[in-house]
A protein has these predicted regions:
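Conserved catalytic or regulatory cores that recognize and/or transform ribose-phosphate-containing ligands
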Residues: 1-104
Length: 104
């Protein structure tokens, strides 16, 4: 989990917005890491839940100070929130979520 994603082509804000929504538009579910604050991730979760109406798994590390109250307080049935303590726990949460939502 220490590797970082870097685009080989620099993108501006509009390009990032379009790319990310295109990814969500082509998705059957969403997995979001929410251990730290991110307006962008919150926007993507809301888009997935309320526009695309697809299931979302929001995962956070047990040592996270706190997750967003907007995420934690959301009672949408398509939103699953799971805490993890290590990589194996994270992978198991993801596998279970995918299996429960029609994945392989």
């Amino acid at each position: 989990m220490s590797s970082k994603f870097h685009s080989s082509i620099p993108l501006n804000a509009k390009q990032i917005y379009s790319r990310d929504l295109k990814w969500l538009d082509g998705s059957k579910l969403m997995i979001a890491e929410v251990s730290g604050p991110s307006l962008g991730v919150g926007f993507e979760i809301a888009y997935a839940l309320f526009h695309k109406k697809i299931p979302v798994l929001a995962v956070y590390h047990e040592k996270a100070d706190q997750i967003s109250s907007m995420i934690h307080g959301c009672n949408d049935k398509k939103l699953t929130i799971k805490k993890y303590n290590d990589l194996d726990d994270l992978v198991n949460n993801i596998k279970t979520f995918i299996s429960n939502n029609g994945g392989n």
